[in-house]
UniProtKB/Swiss-Prot annotation:
This is Protein STK_02290. InterPro entries: AMMECR1, AMMECR1_dom_sf, AMMECR1_domain, AMMECR1_N, AmmeMemoSam_A, Uncharacterised_MJ0810. Signal peptide: none annotated. It comes from the Archaea. It comes from Sulfurisphaera tokodaii (strain DSM 16993 / JCM 10545 / NBRC 100140 / 7) (Sulfolobus tokodaii). PANTHER family: AMME SYNDROME CANDIDATE GENE 1 PROTEIN, AMMECR1 HOMOLOG. NCBIfam families: AmmeMemoSam_A, TIGR00296 family protein. Residues 15-213 form the AMMECR1 domain. It holds the Pfam family AMMECR1.
Amino acid sequence: MSQEQLVAVNELNENLGKVLIKIARDSIANKLGILKINLEDYLSSLNDPILNKKGLAFVTLETYYGNSTSLRGCIGYVEAVAPLKEIVSKAAIAAAFSDPRFPPLSKGEFDNIIIEVTVLTKPQEIDVENRWELPKKIKVGEDGLIVEYGILYSGLLLPQVPMEYCWDEETFLAETCIKAGLEPDCWLNNKVKIKKFQGIIFREEKPKSEKILIIKPSEVKCKKEEISLL
């Protein structure tokens, strides 16, 4: 699938970001029984031409504690298998109920989660003759990474992750290898594919907030904490 057929991140704005967040929250609410809608009809009623383009996206859920948050689920799609509006709906439901790291989201948690939608560009494999040159081909604060080895090993980290944990490029590569279930230095293996992508982040300021933040990965603040539950 060509890049032209995908939603480009520069096509998205605050209003569309609000719609994407609403799709995610309404999809979860419907699954919980808080809303009672026909999800297929609901999505069909959203006729924006940009949302009808195929797209790539991740939905992240965080539990809100007032001054801090903790990860509650994160699932996404890096294959353009459906329109962006459907991808966000599917990713939201999967993040809430199918992330193997967490139990399914409960009704009692629904009003206390922050929803974040990251829309991605198409991943591109990084081609280098010398694997030690890989860190120079990556920009922390701009790129996300995918590590693939055969059909059994795959790991992805979003562009905001290395910013949150103050990583340099080599650490970012190593952590993505670990996410794929491989050794930290797997990126030096010529048989391991390394892909990069970019993204734009739409995030609720607070749970169920009307105010949506548009965040560039480079604007994400370092938490200076050990990585947890990625």
